């Protein structure tokens, strides 16, 4: 078994859920975070990467409303950020979630990679592009993950091609683990 594969089989423990900056854990190791529209497959991807169920998958999108921190083998902090763009939250709740994520992204010096997940079957939506534009200052730490590779897409959009040309990116399927090892290698190399 490779070092990469064995690393991802090590234990991962839930640390805490934060709804404000003061609750973020103090850590001495690198941090990676995952963000994407509601129902993009973020929790499924996290579970596939770490070869165990650490992030809750739900049938109802838009349920993660706090920042969830996980400690992987005392070597890596894994952060599950709330999904964005879910229509069934109030404007007030959407604003609170947006502020929570904004505070996190602007304050975490330990953040080494931000994985932005986009549904490959739908392509990037305006809200995805707005999020990427907002995060322009950390562009060098962003990796775009196109999810749901196992599902049929109609055609690749111009927006998708532009993102693929401007960002490090991978297309994955959490369902059959296609592309997961490539993302694991990226994560392993930041340690």
Segments and roles (model prediction):
Residues 73-111:
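Conserved nucleotide-sensing/catalytic segment adjacent to the nucleotide-binding pocket
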Residues 70, 147, 183:
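Residue-level signal for inorganic ion chemistry
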Residues 7-22, 150-191:
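Canonical P-loop GTPase G-domain recognition
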Residues 1-88:
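Conserved G1/Walker A P-loop phosphate-binding module
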Residues 63, 76, 83-86, 121-123, ...:
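Conserved nucleotide-binding/hydrolysis micro-motifs of P-loop NTPases
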Residues 51-52, 63, 94-97, 131-135, ...:
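Glycine-rich, phosphate-binding/catalytic loops in enzymes
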Residues 100-168:
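Conserved C-terminal guanine-recognition region of P-loop GTPase G domains, centered on the G4
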Residues 39-40, 46-47, 75, 113, ...:
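Structured catalytic cores of enzymes that bind and process phosphorylated ligands/cofactors
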